[in-house]
Curated annotation (Swiss-Prot):
GO molecular function terms noted in the UniProt entry: L-malate dehydrogenase (NAD+) activity
Designated name of the protein: Malate dehydrogenase
Residues annotated as binding NAD(+): 12-18, 106, 113, 130-132
EC identifiers of the protein: 1.1.1.37
């Protein structure tokens, strides 16, 4: 007997990342090749015509798993009975805009969306914020949702998987090992140049990746800056921000969360106080996923260098939380 469709809400549906996401979700890459989906597409009133065009293309693919579509500019309609929400749409930073202004502009958007999700989505909804600054946007959405109740505030995540995948690729290049052989990578902190990609526990076919690299200068001066500033490098090269790789990371995050994974994965999740991170701050942690639930991997040793890096990215996040506290 075929499964009941799952409802997936996507904001910013007419945008570049949305366009890279929708066809892969409809083909079963995110929730499984036997799981029908209904896509609930949210975008601004002026983008509705473009959303209609994307829906026409989705129809023309004749995806067996695509059980229905809804297009709307009303968050209450978009999030109705949603099982998964991908919050892609966000106010981009424009020239001359201060980070504080960006936080305030997005704060308004994610307060509305967090409330609408909590009031309308399924109680066990899984929410992934892709739109930047994604950690703090997730923090804001979770705070708005908490006021309503119903949904689990721990299920409001920020996307660190893109940093994780970028780090894997750089390590594969450095070690000459296949990406698929690399296990137990961790990315701590904010999705920003302050993130800390940590391969101290990482292995490749049983070998220590730290021992294979064995180059502190490369780690500090090449690896971490390359991963941290990769988004800017792509804009420089392509003239547009990374859309397909961001969409791919979102699919990876939700797939592992819903379907489970035997691997360590990096997820931006509300802290429970682990590793000295204040409760509620949405922070990149090593996680494992089983049975539709995630848990933070405990007991990892934090050396002096790592603590310094973790504290640096934490400071950025606590500053952001402070900047938006009046909106919460």
């Amino acid at each position: 007997m075929s499964k009941a469709p799952m409802r997936v809400a996507i904001t910013g549906a007419a945008g570049q990342i949305g366009y890279s996401l929708l066809f892969r979700i409809a083909s079963g890459e995110m929730l499984g090749k036997d799981q029908p989906v209904i896509l609930q597409l949210l975008d601004l009133p002026q983008a509705q015509q473009a959303v209609k065009g994307v829906m026409m293309e989705l129809e023309d693919c004749a995806f067996p798993l695509l059980a229905g579509m809804v297009a709307t500019d009303d968050p209450n309609v978009a999030f109705k009975d949603a099982d998964v929400c991908l919050l892609v749409g966000a106010r981009p930073r424009t020239k001359g805009m201060e980070r504080a202004d960006l936080l305030t502009a997005n704060g308004a958007i994610f307060t509305v969306q967090g409330k609408a999700i909590a009031e309308n989505a399924k109680e066990d909804v899984k929410v992934l914020v892709v739109g930047n600054p994604c950690n703090t946007n997730a923090f804001i959405a979770a705070a708005a949702a908490k006021k309503v109740g119903r949904t689990n505030p721990n299920n409001y995540h920020g996307m660190l998987r893109l940093d994780h995948n970028r780090a894997l690729s750089q390590l594969a290049g450095k070690t000459g090992r296949a990406v698929s052989s690399l296990k137990k990578l961790v990315v701590w902190g904010n999705h920003s140049p302050t993130m800390y990609a940590d391969y101290r526990f990482c292995t490749s076919n049983g070998d220590s990746v730290k021992a294979l690299v064995n180059d502190h200068a490369w780690n500090n001066d090449v690896f971490l800056p390359t991963v941290g500033k990769r988004g800017a490098a792509i804009i420089e090269a392509r003239g547009l921000s990374s859309a397909a790789s961001a969409a791919n990371a979102a699919i990876d995050h939700v797939r592992d969360w819903v379907l489970g994974s035997d691997e360590w994965v990096t997820m931006g999740v509300p802290s429970d106080g682990s590793y000295g991170i204040p409760a509620g701050i949405v922070f990149g942690f090593p996680c494992e996923c089983k049975g539709g639930k995630f848990s933070i991997i405990q007991g990892l040793e934090i050396d002096e260098y790592s603590r310094e890096k973790i504290n640096f990215t934490l400071k950025e996040l606590t500053d952001e939380a402070e900047a938006v506290k009046d909106m919460l």
